[in-house]
Amino acid sequence: MELIRVLANLLILQLSYAQKSSELIIGGDECNIDEHRFLVALYKSGRFRCGGTLINQEWVLTAAHCDRRNMEIKLGMHSKNVPNEDEQRRVPKEKFFCDSNKNYTQWNKDIMLIRLNSPVNNSTHIAPLSLPSSPPIVGSVCRIMGWGTITSPNETYPDVPHCANINLFNYTVCHGAHAGLPATSRTLCAGVLEGGKDTCKGDSGGPLICNGQFQGIVSWGGHPCAQPREPGVYTKVFDHLDWIQNIIAGSTTATCPL
C-alpha cells in the first residue's frame, strides 16, 4: 500500500493507515486463470500500480487514488511475465471522479470510472463483470483478488494474481477498528476478524465480489495488512450505480451520492 497522503492535520495517521493502491492479497492462493476475466491491471511507466474491473467493453471501474498520468491498462493478464495470447492494452480516453477536486481524504468517494480509448473484445481471458443488481448483505462471503503484495509489512509481489475469501461486516466494525478515518455507510467493511486474510498494497482498485456480485472496490485499510480485528474498507459500488450509469450514458451533470 502507499502511505495515506492526508492534510497536515492528519499526518499523525500516516504510520497507521495506508491506501492499498499497490497491495497484494494476504493469505490467499493463485487465482484460477478462468475466474478473473474482468480483472485489469493499471500500469504507470511500466510499473504495476493498481487493479480495476472491466464493467463493459469500454469502461473500467477502479479507485480514485489509483489515478496516475500516462496510465496504461492491461486486460486479460494473468502472469506479469508470460503474456496470454489474447491480452489487450488500452489507455484512458476519459476519467471521471465523484469529487471533481480529487480530494482523496474523502475516503467514501474513492471511486474512478475510466473510459478506454477503444472498446475491447471478449475473449478467453477477457469479459466484463456486471454491476450489482441488489445491495450487499452483511454476513456474505466475498472474493478478493489482485497482484498486490502477499506479505506485510515486508512486501513480496507475485507474478500472478492471488485470490481469497473474506467476510462482509457492518461498516460500523471498520468505523471502530479505524477510528481515525471515516468508514461510512457509503463504504463496505470486509475481512477476517482473526486476521490472516486481507487485500494489501497493490490490490487497490480491484473488486470485492460478494455472492457473485461486484459490490466493492478495494480502497484502504490498516498497516500492516491482515491484522486481527482490522478489516479492510471498500467503496460501495451499489450506492454509486446511478452515477456510474449516468456517466456511461453520456450525462454531463451526473452527481455522486452525498
UniProtKB/Swiss-Prot annotation:
Record-linked InterPro entries: Peptidase_S1_PA (IPR009003), Peptidase_S1_PA_chymotrypsin (IPR043504), Peptidase_S1A (IPR001314), Trypsin_dom (IPR001254), TRYPSIN_HIS (IPR018114), TRYPSIN_SER (IPR033116)
GO CC, one annotated term: extracellular region
Subcellular location: Secreted
Gene Ontology molecular function: any one: serine-type endopeptidase activity
Proregion residues excised on maturation: 19-24
EC number: 3.4.21.-
Glycosylated residues (UniProt): N103, N121, N122, N154, N170
Tissues with expression: Expressed by the venom gland.
Annotated disulfide bonds: C31-C163, C50-C66, C98-C256, C142-C210, C174-C189, C200-C225
Active site (record annotation): H65, D110, S204
Hydrolase among keywords: yes
Keywords of this entry: Disulfide bond, Fibrinogenolytic toxin, Glycoprotein, Hemostasis impairing toxin, Hydrolase, Protease, Secreted, Serine protease, Signal, Toxin, Zymogen
Activation and inhibition: Its activity is inhibited by PMSF and p-nitrophenyl-p-guanidinobenzoate (NPGB).
Organism superkingdom: Eukaryota
Signal peptide positions on this chain: 1-18
Biological processes per GO annotation: proteolysis
Primary residence: secreted
Domain Peptidase S1: 25-249
Function: Snake venom serine protease. Degrades concomitantly alpha- (FGA) and beta-chains of fibrinogen (FGB).
Subunit structure: Monomer.
Family the entry assigns: Belongs to the peptidase S1 family. Snake venom subfamily.
Miscellaneous remark of the record: Negative results: does not degrade the gamma-chain of fibrinogen, does not activate plasminogen and does not possess fibrinogen-clotting activity.
Name this protein carries in UniProt: Alpha- and beta-fibrinogenase stejnefibrase-1
UniProt organism field: Trimeresurus stejnegeri
